[in-house]
A protein has these predicted regions:
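Membrane-interface "cap" regions at the ends of multi-pass membrane proteins
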Residues: 2-129, 157, 177, 287, ...
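Hydrophobic, membrane-embedded alpha-helices of multi-pass small-molecule transporters
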Residues: 110-127, 282-328, 382-393, 571
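Selective recognition of specific alpha-helical transmembrane segments in multi-pass small-molecule
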Residues: 147, 151-154, 253-266, 324-351
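Membrane-interface loop-to-helix entry segments
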Residues: 223-270, 327-331, 396, 453-467, ...
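Helix-loop-helix junctions that connect adjacent transmembrane segments
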Residues: 251-307, 313, 346-358, 364, ...
Length: 577
């Protein structure tokens, strides 16, 4: 049997022993290929069950088409076509996707729709952050909130650099996957999953709590599940429809917050006691001492940045250059409203009353500033706005977790069926419906005990932010040649990481009773992901112990199905070994 030939990047002929696993297919005329100039696709035939592997030279590709290749078995490594020439982009798409169809009607999100999806979550924080922060920081709350704005300013470039260098869904999971290992990346993914699940339940419950101010007969147990179900259906309709709803909610919320700021300023200008009220509040005795109060207030104020990381989990659905703009817009909102409301409250309400309204400080400010004084119309408007925007935070969780789980299934960290789309709206129905079931069950289990869930999601998303900064540093070291138009300097990354880590320590100290819940939720999620991640090893173990023949046949069939999926393997030479 004559030996076959393989070609390197310089088009030189290299003899290959006939026992080599890389045997080029006999229909390839390599002399013709050499004489005709550069070639862009060579099929390597792997004997046995491996099918056909196609070598695609992306560096030399200049827009021309490449000849198709016929697989050796029934694997979908190469697309079926009657045409002798298939575009390279379609070839790569068919290698990655389970089906060759593309949705040409898919439209990428613009700046404001992309901002609204994540912005509803982070902008809803002004409804509760000022009140919560005042419990520890008191009259110094606005200082703690400005420190949080500084952290987000640093993280704008940290997130932007990673998103532009690796524009794929997944957030911290994405950057750690490309710079470390699947195991480490899965830890970040589990933290993100826990954060989204807890955020959805807490936001839905808080929204219904505000809704009870408008309708006292509202049953919170069923209303929360109905709200989760509504956004499940909305997400099933598609991201474009969800983004339109999110944009409407975002505009209404920003308008309502602007109205409240105007009414507060009007109240301060009319009242002769505003300055006196501020001086009296400022002279209130601190709970411990000023630095400690500001520190614990800073930890609680970091609750207001939940949602900032969500934009990186649907970056593939955003248009070119949109991702950094979404981060900038969210930073504007948080930096403007959160510290401002905390400061304005010192002019119109005594400190004792501010601390009494821990969860509804803005509604109380609306009552104080309503004109005429006896009316409560502004309180009603703020309650309605809170119902809307906290509901929008539920939508943020749906969109974020869909992008993350879809990415994990593509990377085979989770079952591939989760990434399947329906023919109706081309959405990932298994992920969306599964998330609805999990959040509804969690709401039923906790039965309104939101303190533990709030502590869980606080620790989770701050841990994710810390891992994102670590991923940025590893990216600079390992993948420094990747192109990106925004670059976060080393001092910015290190300072941002330290500030988030310091805030995380404060949150852990303040939530020590809830650490057990965090470990429980994270442990269950991590166990499920690890079982999926190592499912082939689990199947091999079950096959080893034996059993009925039908059982073994089913296990072997499932094992072979997992192993036979097509994949892309990038190599610098013609020899993948």
């Amino acid at each position: 049997m004559a030996s076959s030939s393989s070609l390197n990047n310089d088009d030189a002929r290299i003899p290959v022993n006939e026992t080599s696993p890389l045997n080029t297919q006999p229909q390839q005329d390599f002399s013709t290929i050499i004489r005709s100039g550069p070639r862009h696709s060579i099929s390597w035939g792997f004997p046995g069950r491996w099918g056909t592997v196609i070598k695609i030279d992306l560096a030399e590709y200049s827009g021309e088409t490449v000849t198709s290749s016929v697989p050796l078995n029934d694997t979908n490594a190469a697309p079926e076509s009657t045409s002798p020439a298939i575009p390279l982009r379609r070839r790569v798409h068919n290698l990655v996707r389970p089906t060759p169809e593309t949705d040409d009607s898919h439209k990428l999100l613009g700046e404001w729709r992309a901002t609204a999806i994540a912005g509803n979550d982070i902008s809803s924080s002004c409804l509760y952050t000022a009140g919560i922060c005042s419990q520890k920081a008191g009259q110094y709350s606005f200082i703690s909130l400005y420190l949080v704005a500084l952290v987000l300013y640093l993280y704008r470039n940290i997130y932007s650099e990673v998103g532009l260098a690796l524009p794929l869904n997944g957030g911290a999971y994405n950057v750690l996957l490309n710079c470390t290992s699947k195991f480490i990346a899965s830890i970040a993914a589990c933290l993100t999953l826990v954060s989204y699940i807890a955020t959805a339940v807490v936001s839905a419950s808080s929204a219904i709590a505000y809704g009870q101010n408008l309708w006292s007969g509202l049953d919170p147990a069923w209303a929360v599940m109905a709200l989760l179900g509504f956004f499940c259906l909305l997400t099933l309709f598609g991201l474009k429809e969800s983004a339109n709803v999110a944009l409407v909610i975002f505009i209404i919320h920003i308008g309502t917050m602007t109205l409240l700021v105007i009414m507060c300023l009007y109240k301060i200008m009319l009242s002769h006691d505003s300055i006196t009220m501020f001086v009296k509040n400022w002279q209130t005795e601190s709970l411990q001492n000023v630095p400690i109060d500001i520190y614990y207030g800073f930890g609680l104020a970091l609750l207001g940045v939940s949602g900032f990381e969500t934009s990186s989990n649907y970056i593939e659905e955003q248009g070119a250059g949109v991702f950094p703009k979404t981060l900038r817009n969210m930073w504007y909102v948080v930096s403007l409203f959160n510290p401002l409301f905390s400061l304005l409250s010192l002019f119109i309400m005594p400190m004792s009353e501010i601390r009494q309204h821990r969860d509804d400080l803005l509604a109380a400010m609306g009552t104080v500033t309503s004109q005429p004084p006896s009316s409560t119309w502004l309180n009603t408007v703020i309650s309605a706005d809170a119902l809307l925007v906290l509901s929008g935070a539920v939508l943020t969780s749906y969109v974020g977790i869909t992008g993350l789980i879809r990415r994990m299934s593509y990377d085979r960290c989770l079952p591939m069926f989760l990434s399947y789309t329906n023919r109706w709206r081309h959405t990932n129905h298994f992920i969306i419906i599964g998330f609805f079931v999990v959040t509804s069950l969690l709401h039923y289990i906790v039965r309104g005990n939101l303190e533990s869930l709030a502590g869980v999601y606080s620790i989770s998303f701050l841990s994710v932010m810390s891992l994102f900064a670590i991923g940025n540093m590893i990216l600079k070291y390992k993948r420094g040649t990747l192109r990106r138009s925004i670059y976060a300097s080393w001092p910015h990354v290190i300072i941002g990481f330290i500030l988030v880590l310091v805030g995380l320590i404060a949150v852990i100290i303040l939530n020590l009773p809830h650490i057990t819940y965090f470990i429980l939720y994270f442990g269950i999620t991590f166990l499920i992901v690890m079982l999926m991640f190592s499912r082939n090893r689990v199947l091999k173990l079950l096959i080893y112990f034996g059993g009925p023949q039908k059982w073994l046949d089913m296990l072997n069939k499932h094992y072979k199905k997992i192993e036979d999926r097509p994949m892309l393997f990038f190599t610098r030479t013609d020899d993948p070994s």
